[in-house]
């Protein structure tokens, strides 16, 4: 049995778990997420805890039971608490402005960048150089943050660009004459 799958997922109050024909549906205050059931993994729901057991002793079944447990754990946390990613813009003239589901970025290009948020992700800009992304799906929030960062990744000489809050950019030394 997978070491990760040995620990059950505790379902907090206010989170509803339903087993469908082909998917596990988790509903909470932040929305609803579904997880497709895998044939190698059996999921049991007893006393507010979800347990994951491999249906056979193959390596793939063990791996899938741990993967399923990790993904469902993130879904339970997402629908109850939510996930947040913070980005900061470093550089002269680099600005961000949120207008509903649209993020306008000025990153030193000759044109502004207009990024439309996917379903389930909301954006806020507390200041012109800070972006806060929130949502219930950890994968989607992380993907959106990575796509925004990729517009102007931090460069290694001055550190200018879009970076995660707390990210350490290793700086290079300038060429010497």
Swiss-Prot record:
One of its GO terms (cellular component) is cytosolic large ribosomal subunit. Transmembrane segments: none annotated. It comes from the Bacteria. The keyword rRNA-binding applies. The keyword RNA-binding applies. Disulfide bonds: none annotated. GO terms for molecular function: rRNA binding; structural constituent of ribosome. Keywords: Ribonucleoprotein, Ribosomal protein, RNA-binding, rRNA-binding. Pfam families: Ribosomal_L6. GO terms for biological process: cytoplasmic translation. Present in outer membrane vesicle formulations which are used as vaccines in human. This protein binds to the 23S rRNA, and is important in its secondary structure. It is located near the subunit interface in the base of the L7/L12 stalk, and near the tRNA binding site of the peptidyltransferase center. Part of the 50S ribosomal subunit. Belongs to the universal ribosomal protein uL6 family. HAMAP family: Ribosomal_uL6_B (MF_01365_B). This is Large ribosomal subunit protein uL6. It comes from Neisseria meningitidis serogroup B (strain ATCC BAA-335 / MC58). The lineage of its organism: Bacteria, Pseudomonadati, Pseudomonadota, Betaproteobacteria, Neisseriales. The gene is rplF.
